[in-house]
């Protein structure tokens, strides 16, 4: 770590993927940056841990697809800088009924943005993917750019490069107080720091930090069951067999997504894009009825559509989502203190977009014009935003 005083150009709270990319962009631009993390690294308490995430350009909204174009470039740049593979192209298969409006919207977005994709009829699907069973006349959309990000490796690479660039990462330091002003003061369990600007990327702990600053965002913290299902024939749903990532759009009340067997030999990762509302400090409490219901939905999906997998998960892990009502991010400055920047509400789809999110948060913290239109991400879009203390 570089030797620094306790005064910084910027302090970033939260060393998940969004905070790491924010600190990365700050350090890249020769800013003195302190990245604070309440837990000792690595940890599995938040939203950025685990071996894999889906990367894709397939979105209903043009603005995400446009952001993803730059994200792919930055992910590739990070791979070169780290000297290690962080991404594998597998393609992404989106599944839905022929009438599904979401599938049509995504196809239109990919066409407008010039993204390589392919529409697959029911007949095409059965020929192309014999190890998937199609029971409802499903059609498919293949995002040729889709693939897998190696999440834990990416976090380690970023934290290492931040330090190489002169930034400082302090883990095991929980923030206990933020005093607004110029400079802003951040007090942790160990000491106090000051900076010209502060970026808060604290995931499910965001509102705990914001409440004393007079605002509360409409964030729902969800506990997600991350399930791994054993192949009956090893390798049949693996990366080596060119099996794609999958995203089921209307095969359950919420999306179901799957990643080819990779991190656990012979186990495919399949998850339900929903969970039950829990406090992040209580995520390890006994399972609720909602948990059981979520896993039952996945069991039915696997039994109906993936006959080459055992019908019950072999491994179940936990992850946290922090959702906004519209499932779009919050990237904005505090309405009263413009040197406090907030990145929150990544709603279970933020990891792949972190290279551009970090760039935007860096720009906001340095009072630079943002590279993208931030209208979809302003906190003012929520009428329920509490400003009781402003």
Swiss-Prot record:
Cofactor(s) it depends on: FAD
Top EC group: oxidoreductase
Keywords, comma-separated and alphabetical: Acetylation, FAD, Flavoprotein, Oxidoreductase, Peroxisome
GO BP: L-lysine catabolic process to acetyl-CoA via L-pipecolate
Position of sequence motif Microbody targeting signal: 388-390
Reaction(s) catalysed by this chain's protein: sarcosine + O2 + H2O = formaldehyde + glycine + H2O2; L-pipecolate + O2 = L-1-piperideine-6-carboxylate + H2O2 + H(+)
Main localization, broad class: other
Cofactor note: Binds 1 FAD per subunit.
InterPro entries: FAD-dep_OxRdtase (IPR006076), FAD/NAD-bd_sf (IPR036188), MTOX (IPR045170)
Record keyword Acetylation present: yes
Function: Metabolizes sarcosine, L-pipecolic acid and L-proline.
Name this polypeptide is given: Peroxisomal sarcosine oxidase
Organism: Mus musculus (Mouse)
């Amino acid at each position: 770590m570089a030797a620094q005083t306790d005064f910084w150009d910027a302090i970033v709270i939260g060393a998940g993927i969004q905070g790491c990319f924010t600190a990365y962009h700050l350090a890249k631009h020769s800013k003195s940056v302190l990245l604070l993390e309440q837990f000792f690294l690595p940890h599995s308490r938040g939203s950025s841990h685990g071996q894999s995430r889906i990367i894709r350009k397939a979105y209903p909204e043009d603005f995400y697809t446009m952001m993803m174009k730059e994200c792919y470039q930055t992910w590739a740049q990070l791979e070169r800088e780290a000297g290690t593979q962080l991404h594998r192209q597998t393609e992404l298969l989106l599944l839905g009924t022929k009438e599904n409006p979401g599938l049509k919207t995504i196809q239109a977005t990919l066409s407008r943005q010039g993204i390589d994709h392919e529409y697959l009829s029911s007949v095409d699907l059965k020929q192309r993917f014999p190890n998937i069973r199609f029971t409802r006349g499903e059609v498919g959309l293949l995002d040729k750019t889709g693939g897998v990000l190696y999440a834990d490796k990416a976090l380690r690479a970023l934290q290492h490069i931040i330090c190489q660039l002169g930034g400082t990462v302090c883990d095991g330091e929980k923030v206990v107080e933020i005093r607004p002003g110029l400079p802003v003061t951040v007090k942790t369990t160990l000491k106090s720091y000051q900076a010209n600007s502060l970026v808060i990327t604290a995931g499910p702990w965001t509102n705990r930090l914001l409440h004393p600053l007079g605002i509360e965002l409409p964030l729902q913290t969800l506990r997600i069951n991350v399930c791994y299902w054993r192949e009956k024939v090893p390798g049949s749903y693996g990366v080596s067999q060119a099996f794609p990532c999958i995203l089921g759009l209307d095969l359950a009340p919420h999306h179901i997504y799957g990643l080819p067997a990779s991190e656990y030999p012979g186990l495919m990762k399949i998850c339900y894009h929903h969970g039950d509302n829990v406090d992040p400090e209580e995520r390890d409490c006994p399972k609720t009825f909602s948990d059981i219901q979520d896993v039952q939905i996945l069991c039915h999906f696997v039994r109906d559509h993936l006959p080459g997998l055992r019908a019950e998960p072999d491994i179940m892990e936990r992850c946290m989502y922090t959702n906004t009502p519209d499932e779009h991010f919050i990237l904005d400055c505090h309405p009263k203190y413009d040197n406090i920047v907030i990145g929150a509400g990544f709603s279970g789809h933020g990891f792949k977009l972190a290279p551009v999110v970090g760039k935007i948060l860096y720009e906001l913290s340095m009072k630079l014009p943002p590279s993208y239109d931030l209208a979809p991400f302003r906190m003012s879009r929520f009428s329920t935003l509490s400003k009781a203390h402003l």
